[in-house]
């Protein structure tokens, strides 16, 4: 289990949204068969996944009794499909829920919904090992590390992407090894401007034998947040993305019953 520490430094900030998440009320999970009993059994599990995406903040859901809603989960299903996992070929069930009905129920429960238009985040994922350093770019989208980040972000309805790391980026970041900090003077700020992202994230990964320590820093038009996750790589990356999603959801949630 990775450990996570969080410190907030508020400098200034304004609200802006860049990307609309299209599948907020859709999710999937592995199943053992395609019969009706199996589908009904897993519906509540998939609805829980959707609620995390829609509400955004895990702590807000934890404070509510969702048992009644989950018991009626099947009533909110608008579409279902049986699929094969493209990686391991396991069967999975994908469900789509009624967005308007869910938002109305959540609003009645006093839960705020995170709007489907969400800040788009550029993530500089930097791996340091001794004197060597590597920054993941667009050509590394198939890497295990980025796939973990992308999957965790997808589960939270958070739009993220990698920089190109082309010659332009490489030239501007040639002196970053001794400057892994995120502030207005950071060498990562200038090359980030070309991407037009709402959030600039710097995730510095340092390997310690079997585990890693990841320092997360991000800026949103002057607002800086810094936290750290430690543990096995996949776990530490997922924890960092979850903390980012919780922080953003806490700032941008609105009641949306349309």
Spans of features found by a protein language model:
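C-terminal/domain-edge helix-coil "capping" segments
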Residues: 41-56, 94-97, 106-116, 153-161, ...
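A short, hydrophobic beta-strand-centered structural micro-motif
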Residues: 75-83, 123, 180-213
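Amphipathic beta-strand/beta-sheet edge segments enriched in Tyr/Trp
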Residues: 22-30, 99, 191-242
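Sec-dependent signal peptide recognition
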Residues: 2-8
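N-terminal segment of the mature soluble domain
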Residues: 43-65, 119, 123-131, 135-181
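Signal peptide-directed extracytoplasmic domains
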Residues: 64-124, 139
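N-terminal signal peptide c-region/cleavage motif recognized by signal peptidases
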Residues: 13-16
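N-terminal Sec/ER secretory leader and immediately downstream segment
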Residues: 25-82, 87-91
């Amino acid at each position: 289990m990775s450990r996570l520490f969080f410190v907030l430094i508020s400098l200034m900030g304004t609200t802006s949204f860049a990307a609309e998440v299209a599948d907020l009320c859709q999710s999937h999970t592995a199943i053992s068969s395609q019969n009706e009993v199996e589908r009904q059994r897993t519906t509540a599990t998939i609805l829980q996944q959707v609620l995390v995406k829609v509400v955004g903040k895990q702590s807000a859901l934890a404070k509510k009794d969702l048992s009644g809603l989950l018991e009626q989960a099947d009533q909110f299903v608008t579409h279902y499909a049986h699929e094969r996992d493209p990686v391991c070929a396991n069967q999975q069930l994908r469900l789509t829920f009624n967005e308007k009905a869910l938002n109305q129920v959540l609003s009645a429960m006093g839960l705020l919904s995170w709007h489907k238009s969400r800040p788009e985040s550029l993530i500089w994922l930097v791996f340091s090992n001794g004197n060597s350093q590597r920054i993941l770019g667009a050509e590394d989208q198939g890497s295990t590390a980025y796939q973990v980040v992308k999957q965790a972000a997808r589960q939270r309805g958070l739009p993220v992407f990698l920089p190109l790391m082309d010659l332009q980026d490489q030239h501007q970041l040639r002196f970053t090894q001794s400057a892994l900090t995120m502030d207005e003077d950071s060498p990562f700020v200038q090359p980030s401007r070309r991407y037009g992202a709402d959030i600039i994230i710097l995730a510095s990964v340092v390997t310690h034998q079997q585990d890693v320590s990841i320092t997360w820093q991000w800026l949103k038009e002057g607002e800086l947040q810094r936290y750290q996750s430690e543990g096995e790589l996949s776990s530490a990356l997922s924890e960092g993305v979850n903390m980012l999603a919780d922080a953003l959801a806490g700032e941008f949630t609105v009641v949306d019953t349309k």
